[in-house]
């Protein structure tokens, strides 16, 4: 089966993953984000976050991750569930396998 070609593939749905998705979506890169085993990442197990900019009164980890997810969706991120099982970064184009489906990045002339 031929690999699905994507402009931007993000693996993981913690704060970094969702932030990358928001920026990529705003840059019209049509990001595909795989949420993994625990959507929202480890931060969903944190009860109070008091040291993150923009939340002067603090926020729960679950609420913060819900906010980030909604914002990523709002800008057009394609959110999917799956687990990365292999990554071949030894040559270009890279090949990432998620639950038996392979992905490769689009090259600039293919976009």
Task: Please give the residue ranges for each predicted region.
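N-terminal Rossmann-fold NAD(P) dinucleotide-binding loop
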Residues: 17
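Glycine-rich FAD pyrophosphate-binding loop
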Residues: 27-42
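N-terminal Rossmann-like dinucleotide/flavin-binding domain of flavoprotein oxidoreductases
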Residues: 44-103
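Conserved small/polar residues in nucleotide/adenosyl-binding loops
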Residues: 104-111
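Beta1/beta-strand and adjacent pyrophosphate-binding region of the FAD-binding site
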Residues: 3-13
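Aromatic pocket-lining residues of Rossmann-like dinucleotide-binding sites
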Residues: 24
